Amino acid sequence: MEPMSNKQDSNSSEGDEKGWPDVPKRKRKNSQCSMKSMSALSVSVPGYIPSYLEKDEPCVVCGDKATGYHYRCITCEGCKGFFRRTIQKNLHPAYSCKYEGCCIIDKITRNQCQLCRFKKCISVGMAMDLVLDDSKRVAKRRLIEENREKRKREEMVRTLQVRPEPDTAEWELIRMATDAHRHTNAQGSSWKQKRKFLSDDIGQGPMVPTSDGDKVDLEAFSEFTKIMTPAITRVVDFAKKLPMFSELPCEDQIILLKGCCMEIMSLRAAVRYDPESETLTLNGEMAVKREQLKNGGLGVVSDAIFDLGKSLAQFNLDDTEVALMQAVLLMSSDRSGLTSLEKIEQCQEAYLLAFEHYINYRKHNIPHFWPKLLMKVTDLRMIGACHASRFLHMKVECSSELFPPLFLEVFEDQEV
């Protein structure tokens, strides 16, 4: 087998194929050998084929420490490289020995006679036919790489096949979350047919400056506040229909709802992004453009929601996936002031597991679908935090009378 290592033996030399300095013309002490044992190059002795390398196992050519099974024999890196270069460059016809081809080859003398070293390689069983030329080496490495990639793909398929799907209890949790979403999601799947586009004139009127440097079109702001109360009410109704939420203390329920309300409303708007008209549909009824939403009070938060909508379009989420994402947002145990942290963590863990197993069941074609989708949860948390900051600035510049009571109740006193 052609080795992949290019490591050189510490006692080998790049001059293995070059001429060697003259030595005294007398037989060396180690030159006595049996001519029979060093017969013609065609002599082949079966190579030693161990199942594994034992500690300090010697090279069968020179006795140095072997590094592996090379060209059908256990050899060191030096003899492996010498044999490979000799065959690849067809150097052996030019090799000669000054001592009648009877040199003993060991760790010390191996570089002193190329012919005897090569004859020793052949005599112990190193196979010339296993040495590949450059084109075959490239082809072999390409084949190895292709096989490696093939194994990776097969392993990925096996991994996908063993990913757990929802069990009976999780299917029930999924069903109830999906029902909760469908019963509280305005217009359902017919939102495109029932939406009404906000007039282009709205969002282009006189602007009132805010303390954060942005400006607000009060006419657009008024339009948006009209749909805020029913939108917030639907989020509350969704939470009440969710398994486990009603079992939490009332104080914790209120904290969780205040924390997730903008996040869930943003998600519901983002999944109704229409690339053709470049609009988001709010509360299932009002289609708005980016600038209208921005000038109507959301400022930079508008950009974040529109960008999320564009990003989510490729995920092709169904009602169940949207419902489970909302449940995960709702059951966030890091909201300030919660008392039942452990129970809320357990609730979120249950929804996360059901969510992940449902994703496995759906078998999306997008690579790394699950971690990418979880990143969208992080994006929604950021949108919620940005909106809390934006609301503080709006409240400074705009009269409280402009805000619906439920809007104030939910978004006042939020952490920024």
UniProtKB/Swiss-Prot annotation:
It holds the Pfam family Hormone_recep. Zn(2+) 2 binds at residues 97, 103, 113, 116. InterPro entries: NHR-like_dom_sf, Nucl_hrmn_rcpt_lig-bd, Nuclear_hormone_rcpt_NR1, Nuclear_hrmn_rcpt, ThyrH_rcpt, Znf_hrmn_rcpt, Znf_NHR/GATA. Its main location: nucleus. One of its GO terms (molecular function) is zinc ion binding. Residues 15-24 have a biased composition (Basic and acidic residues). Residues 1-13 have a biased composition (Polar residues). Keywords: DNA-binding, Metal-binding, Nucleus, Receptor, Transcription, Transcription regulation, Zinc, Zinc-finger. Residues 169-413 form the NR LBD domain. 3,3',5-triiodo-L-thyronine binds at residue 234. Zn(2+) 1 binds at residues 59, 62, 76, 79. Composed of three domains: a modulating N-terminal domain, a DNA-binding domain and a C-terminal ligand-binding domain. PANTHER family: NUCLEAR HORMONE RECEPTOR, THYROID HORMONE RECEPTOR ALPHA. This is Thyroid hormone receptor alpha. It comes from Hippoglossus hippoglossus (Atlantic halibut). The lineage of its organism: Eukaryota, Metazoa, Chordata, Craniata, Vertebrata. The gene is thra.
